[in-house]
A protein has these predicted regions:
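Extracellular carbohydrate recognition and processing domains
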Residues: 531-563
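Extracellular beta-strand ligand-recognition surfaces/modules
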Residues: 550-582
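An active-site-proximal structural segment forming one wall of the substrate-binding cleft
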Residues: 91, 128-170, 203, 207-210
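Glycan-recognition and processing domains
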Residues: 388-497, 594-614
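N-terminal substrate-binding region of glycoside hydrolase catalytic domains
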Residues: 34-135, 292, 298-305, 326-336, ...
Length: 641
């Protein structure tokens, strides 16, 4: 059996795409074929073009903000040089870029001189936002419309090959991308605009219509990304935005973009299940409406719970986001630069590998990461009569449920965090919790699913005991055999369409398992189209207490649910000893040689376990405010020039 060898860098192939278009300005005889961001652009993105692709080969794209006060410093005089440079760099480096045109507090001062009211607020945390425009002013609307219209004209003046590098445009209608008019409340009640109020929501819809007219309802289309249109990144609490949801789903003709930030910032935070149930159906093998999702890794990785084991947390954050169907992971400079030194760049390569696996018939890879979350909101699995009233504030209920799984390693390290919202959790939580309110309870998957996991195997947490900065990324969650209870097999099936047909084909399987018992035996069986499953590999453990990767290529895989319980694959216990598994991966074709693997050992680094909680300007309602002028996220000289 050949062990997979380690590799620290692998660049996904970039799809060659021929783009034909009709230009917005002037006469053209072409048609444009692109619909939505290229799948090859899905993966980790840089915030700006700050990092060399040779040093950070996992980068798939970069953002470029074009604030109004930088572009139009004088009325009617436009300086598009910053956007031109960004598009040129994307083209030159064979990557993608997304654009945004921030107004709000980035409105140029001359606009106020034209008669737009200047709004100050009672906010004391955002010194960089001293005032805002009154968005409902007819003068503001006229000038803002002119600015966005001129931006569209300039974008569509680019050559077709450069336009193709613009993956999408983020629609920003208010203050930053938060889709709120102001930070705080207006000091003059005449200009008050509650975020959920009809006036502000109507203004947002007007802006949506403007962007749609300029970028979506003409050729060439450029996809649009919206925030706060239904279930936002705070766990689906913004259903009040029904007006926006109805408008975009009825009027946007291209692929829709959404912000879905929570899941890529950690795992086991409140309301994960709400987010996944809301968006996953639009992101993975969608039928009807099609979406792509972008999220940010802000400063959450420097917070207490994340700093307990940065490598482990980045890995499970990537897994969590991929389970949702997230397309783009926008990573801060500090995290980008620390990734190589601190050993978590593997998570970025892993995310790149799977982010574009959207449609099963064309996907090349699938995974199932074994996991169980104890969702104490679930009254069916955990009846109130046995465990107590189902309320997020009922910590005793969470403790009772966790106690039922304590023999498998389940624990709660920070009880106080259970009652927090997910934004506050990622800022202030100080320990790992295996129970949570509406956390994701099943395995994390992308196109590969386990059949009846709780009936056929056991969940396992903290495989080698209490989690430390040196714990393996795989120690966090796992599943295993329990021979004494008859749980000796795990069955898996691929998403319908992945196999394509019933003909034998070449497929490669990778299984990550923990060698905990000397002499333990298990095997990997698969559906080869016969009446009984065929064995791909037999493994005997050495008991070295380490995680191992077993990779095998099979030449006659049929994978049409012909195995036991309708499975394509099965991990089978072949003795009375129990084995533990972390993840199963399927690849279309031959296995990768060399393969992508994490570092052999997880090492504590200088400053670990010293994450800081929220401070001024970083409250539990808003989450992390980006401070790019702070150490670790400085804007550096462009290295891609």
């Amino acid at each position: 059996m050949n062990r997979i060898i380690n590799i620290k860098g692998r660049i996904c192939a970039v799809f060659a795409t021929k783009i034909i278009f009709i230009t917005l300005i002037g006469i053209s005889n072409f048609t444009f074929a692109q619909s939505g961001p290229l799948v090859s652009s899905y993966g980790v993105w840089d915030r700006g073009f700050e990092h060399n692709l040779k040093t950070y080969p996992f980068i798939r794209g970069a953002s470029s903000d074009c604030p109004w006060d930088n572009i139009e410093k004088k009325s009617g005089v436009y300086d598009w040089s910053s956007m031109d440079v960004a598009v040129e760099k994307a083209y030159k480096n064979k990557m993608s870029v997304y654009l945004s045109f921030e107004a709000g507090p980035k409105t140029p001062d001359w606009v106020y001189e034209e008669g737009v009211p200047k709004v100050t607020t009672n906010d004391q945390m955002h010194d960089k936002f001293p005032y805002y425009p009154y968005y409902l002013s007819p003068i503001y609307k006229k000038l803002y419309t002119r600015f966005i219209t001129e931006a569209a004209k300039h974008i569509h003046s680019y050559p077709i090959e450069k336009q193709a590098k613009i993956a999408f445009i983020q629609v920003k209608t208010g203050c930053t991308g938060d889709e709120t008019p102001y930070k705080g409340e207006s000091n003059d009640k005449n200009y008050d605009l509650p975020k959920e109020g009809a006036d502000w929501q109507n203004f947002r819809t007007e802006c949506f219509a403007l962007y749609a007219k300029l970028f979506d309802q003409i050729e060439p289309k450029i996809s649009l990304l919206f925030g706060s249109i239904s279930a936002d990144e705070d766990g689906g609490k913004d259903r009040k935005y029904q007006q926006q949801w109805d408008w975009v789903t009825k009027n946007i003709r291209g692929v829709l973009g959404i912000k879905a930030g929570a899941l890529s910032r950690g795992s086991h935070f409140a309301d994960e299940k709400t987010i996944v149930n809301t968006w996953q159906k639009y992101l993975i093998d969608p039928k009807g409406l099609k979406f792509f999702a972008r999220s940010e890794m802000d400063q959450s990785w420097q917070r207490p719970v994340f700093q307990l084991n940065v490598q482990l947390n980045f890995y499970w954050a990537a897994i969590n986001a991929l389970n949702l169907g997230q397309s783009i992971w926008d990573v801060s400079s500090g995290a980008m630069e620390a990734s190589k030194e601190e050993g978590f760049d593997y998570s970025f390569f892993f995310f790149d590998k799977y982010a574009g696996q959207i449609y099963p018939k064309t996907a090349n890879n699938a995974f199932c990461a074994l996991h169980k979350g104890l969702d104490y909101s679930d009254k069916v699995v955990y009846p109130e009569a046995e465990f107590g009233l189902a309320s997020q504030k009922n910590i005793e209920r969470a403790e009772k449920i966790t106690a039922a799984f304590a023999k498998y390693g389940a624990a709660i390290d920070d009880k106080s965090a259970l009652t927090m919202g997910q934004v506050k959790q990622r800022g202030n939580q100080a320990g790992f919790n295996d129970a949570g309110w509406k956390i994701w309870s099943d395995n994390y998957s992308r196109l590969l699913y386990q059949i009846n996991p709780d009936e056929t195997c056991i969940p396992i947490w903290r495989v080698n005991g209490p989690l430390t900065p040196r714990s393996s990324i795989y120690d966090r969650f796992a599943r295993g055999f329990e021979h004494v209870s008859g749980k000796d097999a795990m069955y898996f099936k691929l998403h319908e369409g992945f196999s394509q047909d019933a003909k034998p084909k070449v497929m490669s399987i990778n299984v990550v398992w923990y060698d905990g018992v000397e002499g333990s035996k298990w095997k990997l069986d698969y559906d080869a189209g016969a009446k009984t499953m065929k064995t791909a590999i037999n493994i005997t453990g050495k008991g070295d207490k380490k995680w191992h990767h077993e990779a095998v290529t099979i030449k006659d895989a049929v994978f049409r649910y012909g195995g036991i319980k309708g499975s394509d694959l099965a991990l089978i216990n072949t003795d009375d000893k129990d084995d533990i598994f972390s993840i199963v991966e399927v690849k279309r074709g031959e296995k990768d040689v060399p393969a992508l693997l994490p570092q052999d050992e997880n090492h504590a680094f200088s400053g670990h376990n010293k994450g800081t909680k929220y401070g001024k300007g970083e409250n539990a309602d808003e989450g992390d405010i980006q401070k790019k002028d702070k150490k670790g996220d400085k804007v550096k000289k462009n290295k891609n020039e």
